[in-house]
């Protein structure tokens, strides 16, 4: 009902106030991916006949009231961001021209920065971006939204190469780049990039197996390329008595066992019967769109060879 919408607006403000009391610097309102606020914005899903439906301003009223309520309850002491779609990717949904207008409107409502994602759940290949979708796949759409506003624009969408992310900012196509799954694979990636240690970076191969699949299953996140995910703050226990260790088999499991033992202080020799390392994962990289798997193999080999 209309009354319930106003109750929801109040709830957003109260949540932001609690966040401020917990000493956060900013809050982000989720207005993307077909979630609640997003459904008000789109004429495809908003069929209301009250003041929250119909024309553009009515469909944006919920968003505007949320921003105003958050600003009121936090007294403007924290930044307010919003995440929107660049394109819903469904017939009758919002396209990039709609989203540019939405971004400009949100700026006029007092928004401090805008975070641009893409697609709704029924077109979720553009939400999760598996390996068949190239990195930075929404760059052109983000650029169009950037031209419509003066506030900082954040882009997201399978950015795995820091060189490309840096280029996006340098060329003025966005102001910041968000790293999601790549931060799970390697939370130290920005530091390594700054120090020009690109070979040391652990790649995200967009397999979705340990992150998105586990999220939907209600399980703890894990990562195929980063076996230490969730234990990053725990130092690798050094061996009290270093040993000479022989690892037989140069597939990814053998490579991982070898570099972990090496990093614990053991002297490790890796044996592989074939001519090349990587095992069956090399075959897995051959189907179309699966080439990024070789980045994982290359990373593991580098960790074994590194002094």
Predicted feature residues:
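Flavin-dependent oxidoreductase catalytic cores
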Residues: 1-248, 252-268, 276, 280
């Amino acid at each position: 009902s209309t009354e319930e919408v106003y109750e929801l607006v109040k709830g957003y403000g109260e949540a932001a106030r609690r966040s401020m009391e917990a000493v956060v610097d900013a809050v982000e309102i989720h207005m993307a991916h077909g979630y609640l606020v997003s459904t008000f914005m789109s004429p495809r899903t908003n069929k209301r006949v009250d003041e929250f439906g119909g024309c553009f301003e009515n469909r944006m009223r919920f968003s505007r009231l949320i921003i105003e309520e958050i600003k009121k309850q936090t007294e403007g002491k924290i930044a307010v961001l919003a995440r929107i779609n660049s394109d819903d990717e469904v017939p009758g949904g919002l396209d990039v021209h709609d989203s540019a207008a939405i971004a400009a409107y949100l700026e006029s409502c007092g928004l401090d920065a805008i975070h641009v994602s893409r697609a709704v759940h029924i077109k979720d290949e553009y939400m999760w971006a598996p390996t068949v979708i190239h990195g930075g796949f929404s760059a052109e759409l983000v650029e169009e939204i950037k031209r419509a506003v003066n506030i900082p624009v954040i882009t997201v969408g399978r950015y795995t190469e820091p060189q490309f992310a840096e280029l996006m900012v340098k060329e003025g196509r966005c102001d910041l780049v968000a790293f999601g799954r790549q931060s799970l694979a390697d939370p130290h990636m920005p530091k390594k990039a700054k120090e020009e240690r690109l070979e040391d970076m652990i790649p995200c191969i967009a397999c979705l197996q340990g992150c998105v699949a586990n999220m939907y299953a209600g399980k703890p996140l894990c990562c195929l390329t980063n076996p230490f995910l969730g234990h990053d703050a725990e130092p690798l226990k050094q061996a009290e008595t270093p040993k000479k260790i022989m690892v037989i088999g140069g597939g990814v499991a053998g490579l991982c066992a070898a570099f972990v033992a090496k990093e614990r202080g053991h002297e490790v020799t890796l044996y592989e019967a074939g001519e090349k390392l990587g095992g069956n994962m090399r075959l897995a990289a051959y189907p179309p769109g699966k080439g990024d798997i070789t980045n994982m193999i290359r990373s593991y080999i580098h960790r074994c060879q590194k002094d």
